[in-house]
């Protein structure tokens, strides 16, 4: 990894940092016991490269979103493009993921955050899962090598020491978690954003949620959905139509009320000074817009 950023290296770098590879970061095997807080300054890459790695890379699993940020930085360094812009013609557009609000949060360095901050619709997540299920093929075109998807969706590092729920210590691939159900793997995000790929069942489940207990989502799939899966298609047209009608009726109504209360005048278009802090932020401003608030 150091070879990609020779101008950002500390002197001297940590010995284990010198051994760190892209593969180690893909499978969360940096050798770090904690995710380094690289966001203390605006130079995230430099802070990561200066962080300490106590264990041999590849010997210890620890979930590390900052490592995924560095993967994004590597892609930008090699291609000269943001990950979002690199993927648009190669992945997003072929899959029909072309929402005008497709967005990826960036660091102060102008690099897509990688490990978080990608805004997608639930339908887009489902398309990504179907793409993985089809081993990188979409509408007759092979967009990604099947061998890569096979490796990404298979255990590349042991995470059995990872405390917590059952589905969090079944192994980890290239940015994908292995699940307790045979052959199933998933991408997941904070508070229950899921893309669950089930090759044996030829099925994908996409979820967006806001839960503190992310395990509830998976338990619902294992306990309620999988037992009802059959190899044959529904032969009862009336039952099929009933299912479709039920699905179309499931929605969360919009919250009623005004977009902003009377207190908006107290903070809208105001700037506030901020005391000394680790993030180096010295002021904040708020601006009310049509669809939300800009900070």
Regions found by a protein language model. Give the residues of each.
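Active-site helix/loop module of the DD-peptidase/beta-lactamase fold
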Residues: 1-28, 50, 79-115
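Conserved catalytic neighborhood of penicillin-recognizing serine enzymes
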Residues: 9-35, 56-57, 66-67, 120-123
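Active-site Gly/Thr loop motif
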Residues: 99-101, 150-207
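Active-site-proximal binding-pocket segments
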Residues: 94-153
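Alpha-helical scaffold elements that line and support the substrate/ligand-binding pocket
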Residues: 25, 62-92, 96, 124-135, ...
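Flexible glycine/proline-enriched surface loops and loop-helix/loop-strand junctions
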Residues: 52-57, 67-69, 106-114, 180-184
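Short, gly/Ser/Thr-rich active-site loops of penicillin-recognizing serine hydrolases
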Residues: 215-282
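N-terminal glycine/threonine-rich, aromatic-flanked beta-hairpin/loop signature
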Residues: 277-295
């Amino acid at each position: 990894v150091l070879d990609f950023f020779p101008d950002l290296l500390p002197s001297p770098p940590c010995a284990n940092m010198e051994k760190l590879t892209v593969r180690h970061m893909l499978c969360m095997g940096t050798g770090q016991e904690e995710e380094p807080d690289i966001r203390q300054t605006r130079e995230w890459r430099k802070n990561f490269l200066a962080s300490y790695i106590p264990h041999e890379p590849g010997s210890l699993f620890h979930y590390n979103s900052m490592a995924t940020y560095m993967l994004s930085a590597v892609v930008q360094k090699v291609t000269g493009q943001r990950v979002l812009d690199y993927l648009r013609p190669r992945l997003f557009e072929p899959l029909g993921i072309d929402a005008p609000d497709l967005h990826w949060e960036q660091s102060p360095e102008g690099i897509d955050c990688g490990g978080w901050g990608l805004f997608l619709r639930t339908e887009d997540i489902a398309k990504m899962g179907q793409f993985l299920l089809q081993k990188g093929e979409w509408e007759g075109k092979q967009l990604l090598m099947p061998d890569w998807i096979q490796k990404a969706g298979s255990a590349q590092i042991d995470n059995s020491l990872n405390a917590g729920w059952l589905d969090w210590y079944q192994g980890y691939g290239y940015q994908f978690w292995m699940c307790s159900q045979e052959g199933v793997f998933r991408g997941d995000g904070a508070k229950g954003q899921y893309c669950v790929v089930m090759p044996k069942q030829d099925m994908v489940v996409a979820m967006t949620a806001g839960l503190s207990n992310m395990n509830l989502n998976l338990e619902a799939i294992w306990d309620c959905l999988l037992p009802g899966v059959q190899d044959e298609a529904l032969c009862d047209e009336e039952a099929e139509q009933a299912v479709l009608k039920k699905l179309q009726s499931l929605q969360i109504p919009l919250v009623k009320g005004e977009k902003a209360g009377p207190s908006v005048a107290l903070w809208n278009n105001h700037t506030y000074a901020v005391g000394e802090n680790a993030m180096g932020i010295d002021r904040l401003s708020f601006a009310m817009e049509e669809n939300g608030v800009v900070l």
